[in-house]
Amino acid sequence: MSWTPFVDSQFVAPSNGLIQKGLIMGRDGTVWGVSDGWAVTAQEAKNLAGQVANPSSVPASGITLGGVKYMGLVADEENFQGFSSSKKQGVSGVVLKSAVIIGLFGEPHKNPNAYSFLKGVADSLVNAGTLQ
């Protein structure tokens, strides 16, 4: 099953422009669904899975998704954020037991808003029993 339709219809579209692109991947680095136009490679997803398992590595190494390197701002067992000043965009992610939910946001929207929105999506999926 591809999660791409869910990504676009349930957290990109309803975010009213806050989340520009989305990605859901397994904790093993397997891409489940990604928005069209966000060319996240299998290797980038695998690298991110390693960073999720070792969040202290994010501030030093940054996060690379879709060919863009984001400076790692914060990372812990539950979330991470990164920002690219050259691209004027950032990434925010929510870490679950089985999956990672990631959103790409633009500079006008600061990462706490993106994280809060994505956390709401993640909580809904967990509460529905869809993900853990």
UniProtKB/Swiss-Prot annotation:
Q: Which Pfam families match?
A: Profilin
- Record localization: Cytoplasm, Cytoskeleton
Keywords associated with the record: Actin-binding, Cytoplasm, Cytoskeleton
Q: Check the record and name the SMART domains matching this protein.
A: PROF (SM00392)
Q: Which GO terms describe its cellular component?
A: cell cortex; cytoskeleton
Q: What is its main location?
A: cytoplasm
One Gene Ontology molecular-function label: actin monomer binding
Disulfide-bonded cysteines: none
The entry assigns this protein to a family as follows: Belongs to the profilin family.
Q: What does this protein do?
A: Binds to actin and affects the structure of the cytoskeleton. At high concentrations, profilin prevents the polymerization of actin, whereas it enhances it at low concentrations. By binding to PIP2, it inhibits the formation of IP3 and DG.
Subunit structure and binding partners: Occurs in many kinds of cells as a complex with monomeric actin in a 1:1 ratio.
Q: What's the protein called, per UniProt? A: Profilin
